[in-house]
Amino acid sequence: VCSYVDDIYELAQALAKQDDITVIREKDYIKKPKENGYRSYHMIVSVPVFFSDQTKDMAVEVQIRTIAMDFWASLEHQLKYKKDIPNQQSIVDQLSRCAQQIASLDRQMYQVRRQIEMSEDLPTEEEILFEKLRRIDIATNE
């Protein structure tokens, strides 16, 4: 889960550049959201898994999204399992509108960040990427 949409693409690019990771497939549901409004970036990657006697490549799915996208996806997932709701199309329409509002919020937050970055001394792209990779390493080791 990332703070901003551009972080998603930077992270996906950084993962794809890893020597021990092979990208099998990518789906960009941010540029082409699902019909219900779902937005996220999916990658199927092959990663080495180390066993006591061998190393085996395994396919795993990585889903990268913003905090706002994750909020929507989590609630939509819970709500879609509620059965026997009258006027379900109304619910679907409302969820889709919420997804559009969240996408708009993501864009606005990105603009706020850019404004702030332009007014202060910024870390280099290399420093930003290193910090993102450090966070990934911490998250995978927890």
What are these regions (language model features)?
Residues 1-109:
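Long beta-strand-rich cores associated with HINT superfamily self-processing modules
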